[in-house]
């Protein structure tokens, strides 16, 4: 089933390749959406795709790239909206 997932990631997640890491894994999983740095030092991720793929992406997000340190994750699933054509970073 298609779903939308909102994720906010805290820790050492800016300046360490975190958004690009998420973008690469999202593309491999057929997920569309974006990853964006926020002023508070966290990263916001909005992703749409099949629920199973979103769960896999969430596992990658929890691990993060080698230089990152994920300290806390908040996430929720929502109804699919289909508003993205690819996965972007901001």
From Swiss-Prot:
Residues in Acylphosphatase-like domain copies: 4-90
Q: What is this protein called?
A: Acylphosphatase
Which protein family is named in the record?
A: Belongs to the acylphosphatase family.
Q: What is its EC number?
A: 3.6.1.7
NCBIfam families from the xrefs? Answer: PRK14433.1 (NF011007), PRK14440.1 (NF011012)
According to its UniProt entry, this protein's organism is Sulfurisphaera tokodaii (strain DSM 16993 / JCM 10545 / NBRC 100140 / 7) (Sulfolobus tokodaii)
Supply the alphabetized keyword list.
Hydrolase
Catalytic class of the enzyme: hydrolase
* Gene Ontology molecular function terms on file: acylphosphatase activity
Q: Which InterPro entries match?
A: Acylphosphatase, Acylphosphatase-like_dom, Acylphosphatase-like_dom_sf, Acylphosphatase_CS
